[in-house]
Amino acid sequence: MNETKEMPIIFNSEMVRAILDGRKTQTRRIVKRQYISHKQELRLCDDGYFYWWMKDAETHQPRRVSCPFGKTGDRLWVRETFQGPFVDYNDSHDLFKNPESYQKPENCIYRADCGQYPSFYDADDNLRQGWRAAIHMPRWASRITLEITDIRVERLNEISEEDAIAEGCYTDDEYGFNAQPRLWPCQKCQGDQTYAAYANGVYYVDCRECDTAKKRFKLLWESIYGFNSFDNKRVWVIEFKIIEKR
């Protein structure tokens, strides 16, 4: 009987908001070992592992490849930028005596809920603390748990319009409410209908006639991984659903 495993996974604040809003049900992460040959591909076999195959071949290499985030049915606990635990002033003495009893998500503050403020501060501005990076979030502070519903491998540039939307990019209808007209011309049609968006790390796009969800995902990807990072590497495509949020 296969045991369900839990693994941590990091999301930035924009993607956390997309998950909580129900707009993000996929994530793509780079496969660490990349073969140069386009004749090779990673396939999922009956034993639940991926193997390198030559295209149209009947056998695979003996070394299996596992997705570092688990398999279908496993769980992911989300790491995000946060601060805490915080308690009322009257409980502060007990916090130092018995800190474990306050180590709960309900005693934490999350940057995804607070915009782009450089630090956390309370309502009276008496307490200011820098945010704690997502990489340092302990398990007890995580408020979101996901279940993996599917894993596959594909080239980054093969993403479809539907999958780009499932990555947390706005749909065309949603995007219209989050865009403002700009004056410079669209690079493709040379019109004056270029729009700017201020969500999910996207700062400029083509005009409505030229824009696609895939282009918005490309800009989102490069805002996270750097300029020219949308270079068609093989990626793990992890689909998930929320099973807990607190």
Label the predicted regions.
Residues 1-246:
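Secondary-structure transition motif
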